[in-house]
């Protein structure tokens, strides 16, 4: 498989004291993010793709357990920038006042044009295999998505589903469903790497 020696840096959003958003039944976004990220890490390894996890457990990201005066996001970005030939895939969940909203959506950095292709590959595979009725489109990030806005490497943020939608939360709480999501994200990544336009 052609990977161009790229390293996929997997960011499980939030962690530790930062739970992210949550569902009506109290399920924390940080836990769903980590579970999907760990599945993604396993699938990428099976495919022979170099990858790293920013966090592997329920913690904030402070390298070497120190320098807590700096924000978690600054540290994550510094870590990504320290990896040669990195491609950032950040895993998150969405939330909205309308509990009927559902489905994956992927944000991408404007700083590296090929990021849009990566985002499109991920969403298209998810629509094909899991969410055929999903009508969402991917979006270019603005400054409210700091890690994407400041990214200097190909970067996407995968909003896997809505924590405000009870049915989608039920899906996201399922280990089998999370593995299916991780599989379609993996397919999108492998297509992107094989296209070699980064």
Language model regions located:
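Extracellular cell-wall/glycan-interacting regions and their flexible linkers
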Residues: 1-8, 16, 21-25, 42, ...
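Catalytic-core regions of hydrolytic enzymes
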Residues: 1-118
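Glycine-rich, flexible loop/turn motifs
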Residues: 18, 69, 102, 134, ...
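Short, low-complexity, polar/charged sequence segments that are solvent-exposed and flexible
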Residues: 29-31, 107-111, 124-128, 175-179
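Charged/polar, solvent-exposed surface patches and flexible loops
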Residues: 75, 124, 170
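Active-site-adjacent mobile loop/cap segments within catalytic or ligand-binding domains
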Residues: 78, 83, 90, 97, ...
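Active-site-adjacent substrate-binding region
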Residues: 114-141
């Amino acid at each position: 498989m052609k990977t161009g020696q790229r390293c996929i840096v997997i960011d499980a959003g939030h962690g530790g004291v930062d739970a992210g958003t949550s569902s009506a039944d109290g399920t924390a976004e940080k836990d769903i993010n980590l579970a999907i990220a760990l599945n993604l890490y396993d699938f990428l390894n099976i495919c022979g793709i170099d990858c790293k996890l920013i966090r592997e457990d329920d913690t904030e990201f402070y390298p070497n357990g120190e320098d807590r005066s700096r924000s978690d996001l600054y540290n994550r970005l510094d870590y990504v920038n320290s990896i040669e030939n990195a491609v950032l895939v950040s895993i998150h969940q969405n939330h909205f006042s309308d509990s009927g909203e559902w489905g994956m959506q992927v944000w991408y950095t404007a700083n590296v044009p090929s990021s849009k292709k990566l985002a499109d590959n991920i969403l298209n595979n998810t629509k094909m295999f899991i969410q055929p009725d999903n009508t969402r489109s991917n979006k270019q990030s603005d400054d409210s998505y700091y890690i994407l806005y400041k990214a200097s490497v190909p970067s996407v943020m995968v909003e896997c589903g809505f924590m405000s939608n009870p049915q989608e939360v039920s899906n996201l709480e399922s280990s089998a469903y999370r593995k299916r999501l991780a599989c379609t994200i993996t397919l999108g990544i492998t297509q992107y790497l094989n296209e070699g336009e980064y």
